[in-house]
Amino acid sequence: PSMDARRGDVYNALYKNSEKITPERAVSLEELLNELDGKETVFTGDGVFAYREKIAEKMGGFAYFAPPMHMLSHASSIAYLAEKKAENGEFDDYHTILPVYLRTCQAEREYNERMKEFKTN
């Protein structure tokens, strides 16, 4: 999956079938496409809406795009994955599940900059 992280970056993780082969990360679209060069890849996520033409241009016949109804995450998909894990005896403690933030939001970055300036004055 790829999510538009703005400024030419995408949030993503790479999977082969259901095995995760990279951690969640924020990388430039160019870096991601160079990593995938010559590998058949299915693209999902809102990053596809923003970068489909660039992906197709760079990847050519190696790029496949999920149909629109499967492009974005749905709660039912998360429930399905949880069910599959449970069938394999894997359970997550819902009290410990947290979102993954790969970089600070713009408001937080600006606040930190102001605080840094304030401390130096």
What are these regions (language model features)?
Residues 1-72:
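Surface "functional belts" at beta-alpha junctions
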Residues 66-121:
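Acyltransferase
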